[in-house]
Regions:
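A short beta-strand element within the Helicase C-terminal
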Residues: 113-114, 238-242, 247-263, 268-271, ...
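Walker A/P-loop
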Residues: 20-42
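Post-DEXD/H (motif II) to motif III coupling segment of the RecA-like Helicase ATP-binding lobe
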Residues: 122-179
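Conserved pre-motif I regulatory segment
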Residues: 1-28
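Conserved helix-turn-beta segment of the N-terminal RecA-like "Helicase ATP-binding" lobe
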Residues: 52, 62-86
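Conserved strand-helix element at the start of the C-terminal RecA-like helicase core
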Residues: 55-65, 187-208
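Conserved segment of the helicase C-terminal RecA-like domain
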Residues: 275-302
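Conserved helicase ATPase core of P-loop NTP-dependent helicases/translocases
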Residues: 81-90, 212-245
């Protein structure tokens, strides 16, 4: 597999940083530009170069955990330990993938010299001290995010090596789709993705819209996955989504999203927009906003993806 220049740079930066006694590396790249590949290769290099080295990949959800597990199994015959709910990684596992929630109570299993790969590290927020404590428990941390702007994330990586791929450069290199921000129009498929403010709003809108479905917080996981698969298969053209759900249902063919709720969270805005930015030849991502203020908020959030903000050491 041929790597893109920003992936090569990330691997080189990590290799240099990992010669130190302690390191923080932050990789900020737009959605769909290969952060999973970066994480997998860094993990494999770490265990290959250290006879007793261990890696924990910390993820935010079960679908993302499964994505990482598939990628690592393509690269190694080493057993992959899983920390998720009732699943526990054996103490002999050198490659471990863990959900944040499960890792909280199992940190004692992992010495400080374990490499932590913190996927979607914007979750390391000061308002979520348990998430921040995860990263502070390790001497070496690689953080990956398109939006590393939460206060906790900025604190954790304030003195860090940093690799950044600006959004406009990713568009120019055809790594992500070009985008347009447009006034609201009635959602239409195929593969329409509509973000709303709550489960109730999603359920009500879906009930009024023929051939649509919805997913939300606290919807059982199996039911949620079944609905996503129906949407991907074209059985339902429109998927209404609680805006708190931002991971685990990527679909590169998704051409447009609708944002029906203003939010002050630039992290959330970029994560929602990112669902439509996956590259396909000829694709233009159209991002529809319910209000003029929402359009301006989204423009400001995406523009923030074009400038680094944290100190490089």
């Amino acid at each position: 597999m041929q790597l893109w220049p920003h992936q090569i740079e990330a691997l080189q930066v990590c290799a240099r940083a990992h010669t130190q006694r302690r390191s923080r590396v932050l990789v900020q790249v737009p959605p769909g530009t290969g952060k999973t590949e970066i994480a997998a290769r860094v993990a494999m290099s770490w265990v290959a170069e250290r006879p007793f080295g261990r890696v924990v990949v910390c993820v935010s959800s079960a679908p993302v955990l499964e994505q990482f597990a598939r990628r690592l199994r393509e690269s190694t015959r080493l057993p992959i330990g899983i920390e998720r709910a009732q699943l526990r990684a054996p103490s002999s596992a050198r490659l471990v993938i863990a959900t944040q929630q499960s890792l909280w109570g199992r940190l004692a299993k992992y010495p400080r010299d374990t490499l932590l790969i913190y996927d979607e590290c914007h979750h390391g927020n000061l308002d979520a001290p348990e998430n921040l404590r995860l990263a502070q428990s390790f001497d070496h941390v690689l953080g990956l995010s398109a939006t590393p702007w939460s206060p906790g994330c900025e604190q954790l990586f304030a003195e860090s090596h940093r690799v950044t791929l600006p959004l406009f450069q990713a568009e120019q290199a055809q790594l992500i789709a070009p985008h347009e921000i447009l006034p609201w129009t009635e959602p239409a498929g195929p593969l329409a993705l509509v973000f709303l403010a709550s489960n109730q709003a999603c359920e009500e809108r879906s009930r009024k819209t023929p051939r649509s479905t919805w997913i939300g917080v606290q919807v059982p996981e199996l039911q949620r996955r079944a609905r996503i698969q129906h949407w991907k298969a074209g059985a339902v053209p429109i998927l209404y989504v609680n805006r708190m759900l931002l991971e685990g249902f990527d679909e590169p063919r998704c051409p447009h999203i609708w944002l029906d709720k203003e939010t002050d969270s630039q992290i959330q805005l970029v994560q929602m927009a990112g669902r439509a930015l996956r590259y396909r030849p000829g694709k233009v991502a159209r991002l529809y906003c319910a209000t003029a203020d929402g359009e301006e908020q989204l423009r400001a959030a995406l523009q923030r993806c074009n400038r680094p903000q944290l100190k490089l050491v």
